[in-house]
């Protein structure tokens, strides 16, 4: 029963973890870099990538998804104006996760991380992943209780990408999964 609840909650979790409002939030905003850099494996400057037309399901390859513990391909699940993709592992597939596991990549081309509503978060820690500054948010409050963690990466002052994980009740494991997934996503970002 808990596994079905977790899997059904995936789209709602993605929306709650990345939904922002106009209130002042806990944490320190971190400004991003505006300089151009070269995309991995190509010569197109990453700053020229149109974030709004990016498919979030291309952010984790099959190998990368397997390395963080979720099957591929991801399932596109745009929620509340965010471009989002979910990768799920059911409890049947891995008995270590009695409630399953969910990893989401959500792209918000119109709001920066300072606009996220993180009131109720247990821990907000500034972080850097590759060349992107951001924040690690443990138990982001609201629907994101124990067993949830997200890494918000600054793309610009008005855009960000959130990589989130839900692992049942183990928040530290969720933060480990979200951090490893963010490290795979980051080189593909502008």
Name every feature range the model reports, one short phrase each.
Residues 1-11:
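Bacterial N-terminal signal peptides that target proteins for export
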Residues 2-3, 45-48, 109, 166:
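A short, structure-level motif marking secondary-structure boundaries and short turns
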Residues 16-20:
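C-terminal motif of bacterial Sec signal peptides marking the signal peptidase cleavage site
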Residues 22-25:
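Bacterial signal peptide processing site
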Residues 28-99:
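Extracytoplasmic low-complexity, Pro/Thr/Ser/Ala/Gly-rich segments
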Residues 71-137:
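Short, solvent-exposed recognition patches
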Residues 123-190:
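A short, solvent-exposed beta-edge/loop patch
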